[in-house]
Amino acid sequence: MQGLVRAILRDLCLLNPDKPVIVAVSGGPDSLCLLDVLHKNSYPLIVAHLNHGLRSEAESDAWAVRREAEKRSLHFVLGEDDVATFAADNALSIEEAARIKRYQFLFTQAEKFDAQAVAVGHTADDQVETVLMHLLRGSGLSGLKGMPIRALPNSWSRDIPLVRPLMSVWRTEILNYCREHDLKPVIDQSNLNTTIYRNRLRHELIPNLESYNPSVKQVLYRTTQILAGEFDVLERVVDQAWESVLLDQGKSFVALDAAILERQPVGVRRQLLRRAIAVLRPELRDIDYESIERGLAFLAEPSQTNQIDLVAGLRLMLEGDRLWLATWAAELPSSWPQMAGQDSLRLGVPGDILLPAGWRLRASKVAEM
């Protein structure tokens, strides 16, 4: 296992042995194994741990991680957050809120310490569980290819990669490593709670699938590798199409050439719309199939108001051959008159009215022929 991870660190994670790495350590087997392997490969490490404020054992977990850092003479940073309040305020599940807060903390530390990467302890088992979750939610190729070993750009940074050195290692190998090297991970009892969706997959669905095929996890893992390669091919096609279809872009809007977009194969159209959404909502995961198909249907047959509410507070609007994806509050470039679809104005005939950005709408009677 150590030889495999060493090669991944060098060849796939592309880590420099001389620059700091933020290593996320919860204290569980996966992250403790990651810490130990990185340390034994002499990477300069900063051990980062976030107390989510959710479990009574949280403080003792933080102390356990601190001791592991001190044992190796490594710098330790501790963050604390109120995940439950954040989840309630943003209508998120506790699991999703914890994930967001954890990565925000990790990448804040990475910027603070000028780290070359953030390393997390995702394993091959995590990959299988993630892909199953995406499959059951109706994800496309981008979801079924799973998590990359090195992600740059990612939802948290365009400059600092997120790396997963243990992605090719199975959980059984992790547990064996911990035993062989006398590592004492903390045990998070919430991982046994099957009311949590991922835990239910891990403890109920996957064992059930293994009764049909004992190697189902290995099969699913290989499938992610195949799909990741095919996705790379598709991405190159989409990169070229993006250059021709993108007309304008700002912090709160993306403008696409509707005519060129419609001429693309449907698979490329889907990916172009996904990319436009990702530009404005980089943190958004698992863009659902229905939203993408609704966007493409709107492109083919616009609604009466020429705009629809698409996803995550974004609207899609068609203006001539220009397809806008924008936040509802976006101020669009004034090459065309802008008027929210739900507004109405009274226009006398003859008469004129002023529109935003200096535009004037004028009506006149045409003499009958």
What are these model-derived regions, one by one?
Residues 1-210, 236:
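Core alpha/beta nucleotide-donor-binding catalytic domains of modification enzymes
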Residues 2-30, 46, 50-52, 81-83, ...:
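AMP-forming adenylation/ATP pyrophosphatase catalytic core
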Residues 113, 213, 277-281:
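A broad structural signal for alpha-helix termini and local helix breaks/kinks
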